[in-house]
Regions:
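Bacterial N-terminal signal peptides that target proteins for export
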Residues: 1-10
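A mature extracytoplasmic/lumenal domain signature
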Residues: 64-67, 75-76, 120, 132-136, ...
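Short beta-strand edge/turn micro-motifs at domain boundaries
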Residues: 25, 129, 144-169
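Short, well-ordered alpha-helical segments enriched in acidic and aromatic residues
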Residues: 55-80
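Short, low-complexity N-terminal intrinsically disordered segments enriched in polar/charged residues
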Residues: 23-63
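Acidic/histidine-rich, surface-exposed loop or edge segments in extracytoplasmic proteins
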Residues: 26-29, 74-85
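Surface-exposed, charged secondary-structure patches
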Residues: 84-139
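Bacterial N-terminal signal peptides
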Residues: 9-18
């Protein structure tokens, strides 16, 4: 291949790389967010965490939009199949576990804590998405871990939890 042809191919590949990189950057989602709201969402996570440590189930329920929010771990296929032996329409989620969790906090004699890692917060106006890895710790030992996903919304100038879903390992 001649030097001119090699240079032309190199230039074409370079230009193609720049164009595809620019396209990829434009394809990234844009968010209408601000630092104050991100900070307030992070404070919501901290309040949630502190309510677990202090075992304040009632206080934790005030962080959610209403008592009917989705608050549930994702079931394995084995758990779904087992539940369908008694309920053919079981959807894999079931009723919210918020009340049960609040009661656990209020009545447990164990030391409880939820630790968050790799927190990512995305906010667009009055809607936010929070993802993180967690460890649920009982008496200073990790009981289970997983990924937790929250949807949050801003209403009456306050950030509230709209849904919480998590995996368990």
């Amino acid at each position: 291949m001649s030097k001119k042809r090699t240079a032309a191919v190199f230039l074409a590949l370079l230009m193609w790389g720049l164009v595809s990189q620019a396209s990829a950057q434009e394809a990234e989602p844009k968010f209408n967010s601000n630092g104050d709201d991100i900070m307030r969402i992070r404070s919501l996570l901290d309040e949630f965490r502190q309510d677990i440590i202090r075992k304040e189930g009632y206080a934790l329920t005030k962080l959610v939009l209403n008592p009917d929010v989705l608050f549930h771990h994702t079931n394995t296929q084995e758990e779904i199949d087992s539940a369908r032996k008694y309920d053919a329409q079981f959807d894999g989620i079931g009723p919210s576990q918020l009340d049960g969790f609040a009661k656990l906090l209020a009545t447990s004699k164990d030391k409880l804590e939820e630790r968050f890692r790799n927190i990512e917060i995305r906010q667009d106006g009055p809607l936010g998405l929070v993802t993180f890895n967690y460890d649920f710790v009982i008496n200073d030992k990790v009981h289970h871990s997983g990924l937790e996903v929250w949807q949050v919304c801003k209403i009456d100038e306050q950030w509230k939890i709209l849904s919480v879903a998590w995996t368990i390992y």
